[in-house]
Amino acid sequence: MRNVFYLLLLVVMLAGCKSTKNITSSVPVAEPCYLSSKLQLTIPSGSDGSITTGGTMKMKGGERVQLSILMPILRTEIARLEITPDEVLLIDRMNKRYVRASRKELDDILPKDARFSKLEKLLLSASRPEGKAELSGKELGIPSLERAKVRLYDFSSKEFAMTPTEISDRYTQVP
């Protein structure tokens, strides 16, 4: 009887030494990264001239990047470029036409290292104080526009609503 009492006392004491901490293996869900900025686009034209216009850039990390090019003075959208990991959509608002190309269709045109993740890294890097905020066409993976420049400024990382661009029936698809 005395041995049973000591055994019971030992079990109670060992149970009291149990740790109250629980190990959880849940991985926190990463929130999407939001980034927006104003932009200035300079495209060479003719022998010595160039065209400069403004616009906006919006990025929702891992999902899409939208560039809206605005007409000087009137500030209406004249073109939109929407890039996702799977496709690129370019809309010419002035001439009411658009081009939609899948990643597979662009593999022959773009350099091999042109990836959506690389574009995201460039844009995030440009938003940092020590980052390079002026990018050339070559750095953006568009060798045919290597002399073109995009300057990004007035960055914000506040969350915003961004929906995929819808194209109305008034627009003609360019093959």
Protein language model features and the residues they cover:
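An acidic-aromatic
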Residues: 64-117
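C-terminal motif of bacterial Sec signal peptides marking the signal peptidase cleavage site
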Residues: 13-16
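N-terminal helix-cap/turn-to-beta initiation motif at the start of protein domains
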Residues: 23-36
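Post-signal-peptide N-terminal segment of Sec-exported extracytoplasmic proteins
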Residues: 34-76
